[in-house]
Amino acid sequence: MRQQLSSFKAEFFKALAHPLRISMLDALRDGELTVNEISQRFEVESANASQQLAVLRNKGIVIARKDGANVYYAINDRTIFKLLDVAREIFNNQLIGVRTMLEEISLEAPPGESYEQRS
């Protein structure tokens, strides 16, 4: 059972491992969007948007509904936003760490000398 869960997690995170897919999920926070709306929002071809959405759909992350000629996509489980929010928090924490490190390096530089001048 533990191996199955680890495999599920690996496949799940693999489905999320594309910047466009992450952006699409964030765009779906406010509700469903058509493929055309998504492709226009991110300035990508509809075929590319459809391909990326298919990856998310195949993993059950988004669901699709057809209405005439349009296919609407929505989030299947809104818990995904907690995960995206945690990822954003980790990103912010890393930026804070880098900023702190750069400030410390800057304080160590002799007056009138920048870090770049020492390299």
Describe the residue ranges of each PLM region.
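Residues within helix-turn-helix
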Residues: 34-36, 47, 54
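Short, cationic-aromatic polyanion-contact patches
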Residues: 17, 68-86
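N-terminal positioning helix adjacent to the helix-turn-helix/winged-helix DNA-binding module
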Residues: 5-8, 20, 67
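C-terminal regulatory/oligomerization modules of transcriptional regulators
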Residues: 1-5, 27-33, 37, 41, ...
